[in-house]
A protein has these predicted regions:
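Conserved beta-loop-beta element that borders a ligand/cofactor-binding pocket
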Residues: 1-14, 42-46
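Hydrophobic, Gly/Ser/Ala-rich alpha-helical and linker tracts in large acyl-processing enzymes
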Residues: 13-25, 32-35
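C-terminal substrate-binding subdomain of Rossmann-fold SDR/epimerase-dehydratase oxidoreductases
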Residues: 28-182
Length: 182
């Protein structure tokens, strides 16, 4: 089973479980959260000249709870029976069930929302969550960054019966709850 994650963010809605990276965060949302609580001065926005609606990079962000649900759906898809024998047909290599119901081979699924949010979308959603304006500074593009990247989730929907449920505002609200309580 291979699950490809697309930018996990968020925290448990209780505010008890979340992400607290050591040092300066490498990922956008923990960085934005630390700006919101005053640990960091300003969000760096790397490029505002991409061919996207607001000029900033677009990524597919997925709530960590949706990601956990995706794992459960993947386990259910395997039926609790994962074969250990060698696959002998293309179908079993591709993860189709064998006659005995076991699955041999590899199932590959994208876990994301299937839609993209820009860097500024994330900043503004977090502003709504925390109730204040967050300072940001536009900086030059980083080498190798692409304009957009988001998941094609139709296979996960069709075969696992799974779709992401949380939107960006909920992801940011849960992250803010965690960050402000810890």
């Amino acid at each position: 089973m291979l699950l490809r994650y697309f930018n996990p963010i968020g925290a448990h809605e209780s505010g008890l479980i979340g992400e607290d990276p050591k040092g300066i965060p490498n990922n956008l949302l923990p960085y934005v959260a630390q700006v919101a609580v005053g640990k960091l001065a300003c969000v760096g926005v790397f490029g505002d000249d991409y061919p996207t609606p607001d000029g900033t990079g677009v990524r597919d962000y997925i709530h960590v709870v949706d990601l956990a649900r995706g794992h459960v759906a993947a386990l259910d898809w395997m039926g609790g029976k994962v074969g250990t024998g060698a696959a002998n047909t293309l179908g079993t290599i591709a993860g189709e069930p064998a006659d005995d119901g076991t699955r041999r081979g590899v199932g590959i699924f994208n876990l994301g929302t299937g839609t993209g949010s820009s860097v500024l979308d994330v900043v503004h959603a977090f502003e709504r969550a925390c109730g204040k304006e967050l300072p940001y500074e536009v900086k030059p593009r980083r080498a190798g960054d692409i304009a957009e990247n988001y998941a094609a989730c139709d296979k996960a929907r069709d075969e696992l019966g799974w779709i992401a449920e949380y939107d960006l505002d909920r992801m940011c609200a849960d992250s803010w709850r965690w960050q402000s309580q810890n």
